[in-house]
Amino acid sequence: MTELSKYRNIGIFAHVDAGKTTTTERILKLTGKIHKIGEVHDGESTTDFMEQEAERGITIQSAAVSCFWKDHRFNVIDTPGHVDFTVEVYRSLKVLDGGIGVFCGSGGVEPQSETNWRYANDSEVARIIFVNKLDRMGADFLRVVKQTKDVLAANPLVMVLPIGIEDEFCGVVDLLTREAHIWDDSGLPENFEIKPVPADMVDIVEEYREMLIETALEQDDALLEAYMEGVQPSIEDVKRCIRAGTRTMAVFPTYCGSAFKNKGMQLLLDAVVDYLPDPVEVDPQPLTDEEGNENGEFAIVDVDAPFKALAFKIMDDRFGALTFVRIYSGRLKKGDTILNSFTGKTERIGRMVEMQANERNELESAQAGDIIAIVGMKNVQTGHTLCDPKHPCTLEAMVFPEPVISISVTPKDKGGSEKMGIAIGKMIAEDPSFRVETDIDSGETILKGMGELHLDIKVDILKRTYGVDLIVGEPQVAYRETITKEIEDSYTHKKQSGGSGQFGKIDYTIRPGEQNTGFTFTSKVVGGNVPKEFWPAVEKGFKSMMNTGTIAGFPVLDVELVLQDGAFHAVDSSAIAFEIAAKGAFRQSMPKAGAQLLEPIMNVDVFSPDDNVGDVIGDLNRRRGMIKDQNAGVTGVRIKADVPLSEMFGYIGSLRTMTSGRGQFSMEFAHYSPCPNSVSEKVVAQVKERKAAEAKK
């Protein structure tokens, strides 16, 4: 078993195409985990092992790989860069202790890099910066360093300087040791020499070395004071200070190279060992009560403590059902019985494996700090806590974003329904941001996701992985409804047709609620006009109607109901009568309270070459976008805008056309906003048309 101080649980994350997966491949090659390097552009990379990943050259799932470097165990997670798969980045960050942020040497800080960086900041994950692709046309290491300061508000600590640039890039100077690492053109990582600093770089190396040491020593007042008085610190002292600053995110050690050409990778791996924290150095995960509130206890990373682990990913592959877990405390052995604190059920551990992407090694045991996969677990989902049955506990839960886009899918043949149902069940377990429901009116299966690419991939998996031939509907926007004014109203439910009748009268106030509160209910009834035992029925009845608004049948947001008074009948009143009264009150009062249709607004971040900025901004304006910010860079302009999701379908194609393929964008959900009347009328008409068509079937 590896000592905890020698564990490094790290993620690699960046913008699409900055070279995350290639960087991971090189790490595996250097650590001896793979013999033939797989290239993303050949569809052969080790961590991109889904068909869809290999074909599209992007990472969709977070693949966990274990490897060793200088007696240290690395558990490496290669995360997606595409915005539709940020849920994978989020849940990876939940179980990581450190990370490598990869940036393109020519593209710099691109839209999705910023999103992932923000997520990592929120999760307080220490990081190293790696500026990749310095062999590319237009690469500029120091420009990208400046962008990380200006755009990400990071404090990059330059550890190396490149020797040459673009097609003349051949190596790096290690500022601490004042040594030049120079590779030949064979593309083999081991083919390098250590030489003195090139004569034309001596001055700039000394300048940046002095900045490096001064910044590092800010972590230790005594060393800094001695340095100011002329005492040179040892390299070990400087490294210790850098490690302390990295752990608190005061600095981000910054390296550069070309992963594709195998240049600069060894220094990056050394930096993971030297500067990223081990599991014990990271703040322990909080434990919570049944309501999800922190209870003041923590999952201390300790091999001898009771077992605690978080299931952070479920995957069904050719090996069977795999549950990826991060072990925080204790040990786990084959044959052990563990408790799922969410379900309250125990399970016996049959097989455990250590993953090398799509290969795996059988394990007899695992311990705190490990990221492993358990084979064949039942009734476990992402975010569930697994623990010692004698010491039950719950780790802080994962929260996933709500889907903003949906499509309908129907099997082409009758026999496909059962196959599709089984497949979708597995896919939901694997991806918490993927939701499925059945349309009440049409009976169609509705897939919901985070964006067009997200759902494209899901449909592709259904067709190719599970062999379900599908008819796919047009993408639909997740509209919502709300109210705009406060009204007082009254509703009576009365039914008498022989036997015992039904009677319930409620007087109430309905008003717009605070944003993101959903539905809130309070009662101000004094006396016995509506007995207290019927109040929950009123709340239940009204709340049950919130899923279907009165404008176009979309879910309703942020409504407050106050029960003021009412009346009941000693014989005919019941909970069901008051529940029905509340449902009738909803239908009656929503239009009176100024019911309004809401549409999802997206934060859109676009990069445009200088020549195309006018076209791109004009196009965003036509899409009802509101431009919030423009920042000129060396290679183009970053434009930030709020744009309705309904206007963003097919945007990537339009952007590529306008910019000759050079434009890039990312988007994420921002908030709901009232629809203009013209849009509202169009949406209502489309809903009526669809329902009429379904009625004829």
Curated annotation (Swiss-Prot):
The keyword Chaperone does not apply. PROSITE patterns: G_TR_1, G_TR_2. GO terms for cellular component: cytoplasm. Pfam families: EFG_C, EFG_III, EFG_IV, GTP_EFTU, GTP_EFTU_D2. The keyword Cytoplasm applies. One of its GO terms (molecular function) is GTPase activity. Residues 5-280 form the tr-type G domain. It is found in: Cytoplasm. Keywords: Cytoplasm, Elongation factor, GTP-binding, Nucleotide-binding, Protein biosynthesis. Its main location: cytoplasm. GO terms for biological process: ribosome disassembly. Catalyzes the GTP-dependent ribosomal translocation step during translation elongation. During this step, the ribosome changes from the pre-translocational (PRE) to the post-translocational (POST) state as the newly formed A-site-bound peptidyl-tRNA and P-site-bound deacylated tRNA move to the P and E sites, respectively. Catalyzes the coordinated movement of the two tRNA molecules, the mRNA and conformational changes in the ribosome. Belongs to the TRAFAC class translation factor GTPase superfamily. Classic translation factor GTPase family. EF-G/EF-2 subfamily. This is Elongation factor G 2.
